[in-house]
């Protein structure tokens, strides 16, 4: 397994196993929605009313509809910062703040 996929594979696998609905944003801005049916090194098979093969190089962001728990294969059972919400660069659901702060 490539080092760059040590986070990607467990994350996608958790989404697939738990059948979590996801929004996948492509680099051209298009939003796709569905459940991850399967994936490999290059593509994700996204199922909604039809199955779509989405090339990973075209994906900008994968946003689960709910938090998922995914653990790496490290002895400590390390987790990513994504589902803890303490990584400011991680994709998150947009939250609207009131305009009173200005």
Curated annotation (Swiss-Prot):
Residues 64-102 are annotated as: Disordered. Residues 9-68 form the Sm domain. PROSITE patterns: SM. Residues 70-96 have a biased composition (Polar residues). It holds the Pfam family Hfq. GO terms for biological process: regulation of DNA-templated transcription; regulation of RNA stability; regulation of translation, ncRNA-mediated. GO terms for cellular component: cytosol. InterPro entries: Hfq (IPR005001), LSM_dom_sf (IPR010920), Sm (IPR047575). GO terms for molecular function: RNA binding. Homohexamer. RNA chaperone that binds small regulatory RNA (sRNAs) and mRNAs to facilitate mRNA translational regulation in response to envelope stress, environmental stress and changes in metabolite concentrations. Also binds with high specificity to tRNAs. Belongs to the Hfq family. PANTHER family: RNA-BINDING PROTEIN HFQ (PTHR34772:SF1). This is RNA-binding protein Hfq.
